[in-house]
């Protein structure tokens, strides 16, 4: 094994320090260090690039491989401190020359950020004067070809709520023979396993042994006048030279391309004349020169000289890059936007949504809860969670991993749920009616430009009222998501176009010019170029179909329209052409996730061996040069669905589908069993034998074919850098669809609101922004594993849809974004946070933090209720009076002009909130109520708690504390159940005054019953002949006004937390408080969905 010396240089900028909610005033300092695995012989050199700005209390300093930031003093709440410390870490290491790229891709570069503090006297020379109070470790996922260019906000732990913003740039800068010795760990054996770790310095090899191999020895020629080289050593030298030169040239190309993009996209960047390099020609030239040399000494020297020249060019470019972009504010903003978008998109995985009619909210929902559990188990049995790719810079404590990410289920209750069947209309009147129906589904401003079609193949099981109980039913309506719809649409399209195999691209920008392929900013000229398919003949009818798909650029948004012409029926052609957008958008949208990104760098596949690529004559593509590339698979997916099914070509498919759907009445019993098992199987593929068997012999073969197609698409544009046409909307973020290192001009505003949350973007209102590929910066094996896992999920035919398929999520604005206040808003949005039993005002501290971070620039004021924290065992009337006094006094003392009032309650605090709403003194504020977020609130009491252990504990606590509130929770505070506190409270008006009623519960919570937190009927209550009727009446009293109010939006959540096996988890306490203290749950919940309720 031949080892070479590699050097990767990291530029780490500590931009700002934010005091989110620190408890102590004093001096703070951040210490940074870089670590890599000890099995790799390495040395780390640390330095400061240059001192900038104020020195604050003490300047930054370097201590061996440790760098200390400026020492700064924190005195005020929400204080921001500008650090602008630029730290340089040079990591020199020995790598196997056969696995340079693989090793660098897989290596864990760990950046440690330690927060130190002192409130006493401090001397800069004494490092021990400051104590370590919190630490975070960032894992940097480095690519030798693309480098690393990213920005993250690193939040320290709960007890030291503060954030430091960090920008990281990294590049490979050198590859050559080993020039220094490296400490190499000594292998331990069973004899010395307890001995302290020891290192010995590696021996510096000679140049010849590096170039020709460790076994190389000089051989004299037969005439004795010169030396000769054996073929094996010569081939080793050529391979060694090529591998290192190709890697260096690719690193140069990637850094050069990113540099060009930055300087062009950001006007304020210093413009430099950067020398263009044809890396393919340069590599060929270097290899040809080497092959001309016969003398071994001269050959080794020439190879060494070539490597030295390339390293010099790369280092010079890296120096210029740092000089221009270091501490550049506009670039930092763009990188922050990119990271935030990727992070929110990652959180949106395993966040499911189900749509129900509003009437279903009051029906018996027990089967839904069991369905959630079974879905969760099925998901965990797949590789989906374990294959979730990391972010370019990840911190498992902040971003979550397999062991910490929760699975969340959302139940929406809408006025109408689209459950139409496929219907190809034959006249304009039918299509006009369909357009009218679709228009009614266009709800919010954010979705008004996106047309939708009825979801294909959705099935309905009607709810038939039970004679025994008005709130239970024999059947349940199940809304099927786009996963199952996708496959039926693919079947139809595949049969419509059996010979539709290739699509030539006329896009002039499919070259490797990284300036265009990196840029995320949509180029309207490029987007408007046409894509035309060759004429293909349909085997069944002989009908020639011409697809003229073009991008119609009307500012933003842009939509793809397909015009279809046939040579059989002119009138039908006119009808289909006229309504092609309406009929096709759903099909196109449901296919788009397969093509995961529109634009990518024209760089090589990071795991492709450069030697093999050159031998195959693919150097052109490897370096991203312009090439003629077959994109048939890519276009077959993106454009085949733009073709509307026509009567002439798809009559058989339509009839089969309608025949299958006509069997619903015969299959009701099977359907009921499916729902009870937690799944709802859509139309089976066997029902479409006539259409499937034309291409595939089995379902397995069909799914395998789709998976291969999906993987091939991703590998094609990863390797060739094809510029797929980009489609943007006004709410589209440019970064996710572009390479992660490509900045662009991004405009955003936290003031965007959902005028009616009840009409949220659903699975049917799909958009091209849903093809955001947050994981495309990951190594190819991780991408393939994740795509495989997503295919496994599709095979499960899970109901509903995932938020990762929704184009617009709740948060699009990075934390700490500075925005102008919206002067049109009068007054502040007051959010009152109320703790639960035996709690205090700090219980909802994290909830407050993530709302504030997620809505920067918003006029929000928080009242963290503390009036009841000394006595939460009192009766509810007493606690209600205290909270009401606290709210009114807070508004009066601070002279607040309140435009909105929202309440967030935990556990018992939710009942105090509801009680406040009924008081006459609060009547003035009822018309200002906005959102009620209930976190594990016992709205129906604890009457049917399934945990005997918890019931016993609460009974003991009630007796011990003589607690009125605990007695009232059990509905035993009066002999007449209809005179109990909870029943009388349910009769009083309250919840329907809110715009949003959000109920969060968990099946893992044993303290508050799941059905009580979500205000649902439970099986035990149905069987209880004494109190069950009272329970049903309470549910009806609470929900009926909410459902009757058109302005009130009801949403329920079920949270399945990833909890450790502890006593708290066993008794259900861990899940009960996870809604308060789990940073990962709160960020996922608010960033993906819940922030919109507070906008």
UniProtKB/Swiss-Prot annotation:
Residues 643-673 are annotated as: Disordered. It comes from the Eukaryota. Keywords: Coiled coil. InterPro entries: AB_hydrolase_fold, DUF3657, DUF676_lipase-like, Lipase-like. Residues 269-295, 646-670 form a coiled coil. The keyword Coiled coil applies. Signal peptide: none annotated. SUPFAM superfamilies: alpha/beta-Hydrolases. PANTHER family: LIPASE ROG1-RELATED-RELATED, PROTEIN FAM135A. Belongs to the FAM135 family. This is Protein FAM135A. It comes from Pongo abelii. The lineage of its organism: Eukaryota, Metazoa, Chordata, Craniata, Vertebrata.
């Amino acid at each position: 094994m031949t080892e070479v010396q590699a050097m990767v240089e990291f530029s780490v900028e500590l931009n700002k320090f934010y005091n989110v909610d620190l408890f102590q005033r004093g001096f703070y300092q951040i210490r940074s260090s870089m670590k890599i695995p000890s099995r790799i012989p390495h040395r780390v050199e640390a330095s400061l690039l240059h001192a900038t700005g104020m020195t604050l209390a003490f300047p930054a300093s370097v201590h061996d491989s440790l760098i200390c930031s400026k020492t700064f003093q924190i005195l005020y709440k929400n204080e921001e401190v500008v650090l602008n410390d630029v730290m340089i870490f040079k990591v020199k290491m020995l790598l196997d020359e056969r696995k340079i790229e693989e090793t660098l891709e897989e290596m864990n570069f760990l950046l440690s950020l330690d927060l130190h503090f002192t409130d006493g006297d401090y001397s800069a020379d004494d490092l021990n004067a400051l104590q370590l109070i919190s630490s975070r470790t960032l894992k940097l996922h480095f690519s030798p070809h693309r480098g690393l260019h990213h920005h993250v906000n690193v939040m320290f732990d709960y007890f030291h709520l503060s954030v430091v913003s960090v920008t990281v740039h990294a590049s490979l800068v050198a590859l050559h023979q080993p020039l220094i010795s490296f400490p190499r760990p000594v292998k331990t054996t069973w004899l010395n396993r307890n001995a302290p770790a020891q290192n010995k310095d590696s021996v510096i090899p000679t140049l010849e042994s590096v170039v020709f191999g460790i076994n190389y020895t000089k051989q004299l020629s037969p005439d004795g006048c010169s030396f000769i080289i054996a073929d094996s050593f010569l081939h080793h030298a050529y391979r060694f030279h090529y591998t290192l030169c190709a890697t260096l040239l690719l690193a140069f190309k990637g850094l050069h391309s990113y540099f060009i993009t930055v300087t062009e996209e950001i006007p304020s960047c210093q413009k430099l004349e950067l020398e263009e390099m044809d890396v393919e020609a340069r590599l060929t030239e270097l290899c040809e020169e080497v092959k001309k040399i016969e003398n071994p000494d001269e050959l080794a020297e020439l190879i060494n000289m070539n490597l030295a020249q390339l390293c010099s060019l790369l280092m010079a470019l890296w120096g210029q890059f740092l000089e221009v972009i270091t501490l550049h504010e506009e670039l930092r903003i763009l990188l922050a936007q990119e990271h935030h978008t990727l992070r929110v998109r990652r959180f949106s995985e395993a966040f499911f949504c189900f749509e129900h009619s509003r009437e279903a909210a009051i029906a018996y929902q027990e089967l839904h809860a069991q369905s959630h559990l079974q879905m969760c188990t099925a998901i965990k049995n797949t590789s989906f969670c374990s294959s979730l790719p990391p972010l370019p810079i990840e911190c498992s404590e902040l971003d979550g991993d397999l062991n910490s990410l929760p699975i969340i289920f959302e139940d929406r209750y809408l006025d109408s749920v689209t459950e139409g069947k496929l219907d190809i209309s034959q006249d304009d009147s039918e299509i006009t009616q369909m357009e009218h129906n679709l228009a009614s589904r266009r709800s919010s401003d954010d979705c008004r430009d996106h047309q939708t079609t009825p979801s294909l193949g959705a099935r309905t099981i009607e709810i038939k009222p039970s004679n025994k109980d008005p709130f239970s039913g024999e059947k349940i309506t199940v809304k099927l998501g786009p996963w199952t719809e996708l496959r039926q649409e693919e079947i139809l399209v595949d049969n419509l176009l059996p010979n539709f195999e290739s699509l030539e691209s006329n896009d002039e920008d499919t070259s490797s010019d990284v300036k265009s392929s990196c840029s995320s900013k949509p180029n309207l000229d490029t987007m408007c170029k046409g894509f035309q398919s060759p004429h293909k003949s349909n085997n069944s009818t002989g009908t020639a179909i011409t697809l003229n798909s073009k991008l119609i650029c009307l500012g933003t948004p842009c939509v793809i329209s397909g015009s279809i012409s046939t040579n059989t029926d002119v009138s039908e052609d006119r009808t289909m052409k006229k309504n092609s957008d309406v009929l096709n958008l759903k099909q196109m949208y449901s296919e788009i996730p397969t093509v995961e990104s529109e634009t990518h760098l024209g760089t090589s596949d990071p795991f492709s061996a450069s030697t093999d690529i050159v031998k195959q004559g693919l150097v052109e593509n490897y370096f991203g040069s312009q090439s003629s590339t077959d994109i048939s698979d890519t276009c077959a997916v993106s454009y085949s669905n733009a073709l509307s099914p026509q009567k002439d070509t798809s009559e058989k498919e339509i009839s089969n589908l309608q025949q299958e759907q006509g069997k619903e009445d015969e299959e009701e019993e099977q359907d009921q069993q499916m729902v009870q098992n937690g799944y709802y199987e859509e139309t089976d593929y066997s029902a479409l034998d006539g259409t499937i068997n034309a291409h595939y012999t089995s379902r397995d073969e069909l799914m395998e074919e789709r998976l291969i197609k999906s993987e091939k698409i991703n590998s094609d544009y990863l390797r060739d850098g094809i510029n797929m046409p980009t489609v943007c909307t006004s709410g589209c973020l440019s970064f996710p669809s572009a390479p992660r290192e490509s900045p662009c001009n991004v405009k955003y505003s936290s003031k965007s609101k959902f005028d009616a949350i009840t009409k949220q973007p659903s699975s049917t209102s799909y958009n091209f922004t849903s093809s955001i590929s947050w994981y495309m910066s990951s190594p190819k094996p991780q991408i393939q594993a994740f795509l495989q896992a997503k295919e496994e999920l599709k095979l499960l035919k899970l109901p509903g849809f995932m938020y990762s398929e929704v184009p617009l999520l709740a948060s699009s604005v990075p934390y700490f974004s500075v925005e102008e206040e919206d002067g049109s808003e009068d007054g502040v949005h007051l959010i009152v946070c109320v703790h639960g039993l035996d709690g205090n005002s700090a219980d909802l501290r994290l909830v407050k933090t993530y709302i504030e971070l997620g809505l920067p620039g918003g006029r929000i004021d928080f009242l963290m209720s503390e009036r009841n924290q000394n006595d939460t065992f009192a009766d509810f009337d007493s606690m209600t009076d205290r909270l009401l006094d606290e709210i009114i006094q807070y508004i009066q003392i601070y002279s607040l002009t309140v435009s909105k009032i929202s309440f967030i309650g935990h556990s018992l605090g939710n009942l105090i909130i509801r009680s406040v709403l009924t008081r006459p003194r609060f009547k003035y504020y009822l018309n200002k109520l906005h959102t009620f977020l209930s976190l594990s609130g016992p709205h129906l009491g604890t009457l049917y708690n399934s945990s005997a252990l918890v019931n016993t504990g609460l009974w003991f606590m009630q007796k011990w504390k003589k607690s009125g509130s605990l007695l009232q929770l059990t509905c035993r505070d009066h002999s007449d159940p209809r005179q109990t506190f909870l029943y009388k409270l349910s009769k009083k008006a309250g919840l329907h005054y809110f715009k949003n009623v959000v109920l969060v519960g968990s099946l893992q919570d044993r303290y508050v019953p799941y059905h009580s937190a979500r205000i649902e009927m439970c099986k035990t209550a149905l069987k209880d002949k004494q109190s069950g009727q009272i329970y049903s009446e309470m549910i009806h009293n609470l929900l009926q006004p909410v459902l009757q109010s058109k302005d009130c939006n009801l949403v329920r959540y079920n949270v399945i937390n990833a909890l450790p096996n502890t006593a708290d988890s066993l008794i259900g306490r861990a899940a009960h408080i996870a809604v308060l203290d789990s940073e990962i749950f709160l960020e996922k919940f608010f960033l993906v969905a819940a922030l919109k309720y507070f906008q």
